[in-house]
Amino acid sequence: MPVQVLNRLPAIKILQNEDVFVMQKSRNTFKEQSSLKVLILNLMPKKIETENQLLRLLSNSPLQIDIQLLRIDGHIPKNTPVEHLNNFYCSFPDIRYKNFDGLIVTGAPLGLINFENITFWPQIEQLFLWAKEHINSILFICWAVQAALKVLYNLPKFTRKRKLVGIYQHNTINSHALLTKGFDEKFLAPHSRYSDFPKDIIYRNTDLEILAESDEAGAYLLMSQDKRLIFITGHPEYDAMTLSQEYYRDLKLGLSPKLPDHYFPQDNPNLVPKISWRSHAYLLFANWLNYYVQQNVIKHLSSF
């Protein structure tokens, strides 16, 4: 089934070239009752690239999904035209009194910045608290996990001395959870973060269950007891070349970046990396949509 996005969104042509079924809509299109409403707060620097990545994963489902992109007002992005945000994104006042079936909050390059020094931190706090009352299921990715743990569980920020970056092997701990249904016992997924998520702190101070983890990267997939909050500390949405692009970007900035672990063939950055986590990413997002976003909608409707 298709994803529905606003007319002329750049991702449309890219996804259609990949035989992904995309439906276009105007801002005034009335949503069909059979569609799931999914809101995406896109905090990544290359927003158009992230749109492509997430829409590709969300389209791999029998469900029809109505996508709404959300921006932070007052924040001027450096890597995305303002016109793109004005044309395809809404602001918080536009959706304040609406409800959505799902919310995705992306990562952001803010791992070394204290929360109080982030100019739009008050908007993040407001959105997360609002989401608990207006969203059936929320998916936090990478930095958004750290931000959500602060806002929703009052956990302090934990930062690694060196950036964790690469493709790491993970172990499925709870194979009976619907979110991990069909997961291999061992699977690969990318990480690119300074954030750290100590297991002992999480277990002592939250109701979260760790569903999958990595010996090298630590906790990867977590879920709240009520199953409405889902946390992914890595970047399963990344394309094959995303870590490479980040590596060369940091080289140009003179940051002496660490070579991503287990990523470039023969650890040679001149060789083209292969994607080894695609099936995991598709399955993870499909499970989220099928068993948490849609099922919560069905439960809500059946309560009337």
Curated annotation (Swiss-Prot):
One of its GO terms (molecular function) is homoserine O-succinyltransferase activity. The record marks 192 as: Important for substrate specificity. Substrate binds at residues 163, 192, 249. Belongs to the MetA family. The record marks 111 as: Important for acyl-CoA specificity. The active site is at 142 (acyl-thioester intermediate), 235 (proton acceptor), 237. The lineage of its organism: Bacteria, Pseudomonadati, Pseudomonadota, Gammaproteobacteria, Enterobacterales. It is found in: Cytoplasm. Its EC number is 2.3.1.46. It comes from Blochmanniella pennsylvanica (strain BPEN). This is Homoserine O-succinyltransferase. It holds the Pfam family HTS. Its main location: cytoplasm. Coiled coil: none annotated. The keyword Transferase applies. The keyword Transferase applies. It catalyses: L-homoserine + succinyl-CoA = O-succinyl-L-homoserine + CoA. Keywords: Acyltransferase, Amino-acid biosynthesis, Cytoplasm, Methionine biosynthesis, Transferase. InterPro entries: Class_I_gatase-like, HST_MetA, MetA_family. PANTHER family: HOMOSERINE O-SUCCINYLTRANSFERASE. One of its GO terms (biological process) is L-methionine biosynthetic process from homoserine via O-succinyl-L-homoserine and cystathionine. GO terms for cellular component: cytoplasm. It is an enzyme of class 2 (transferase). Pathway: Amino-acid biosynthesis; L-methionine biosynthesis via de novo pathway; O-succinyl-L-homoserine from L-homoserine: step 1/1. Transfers a succinyl group from succinyl-CoA to L-homoserine, forming succinyl-L-homoserine.
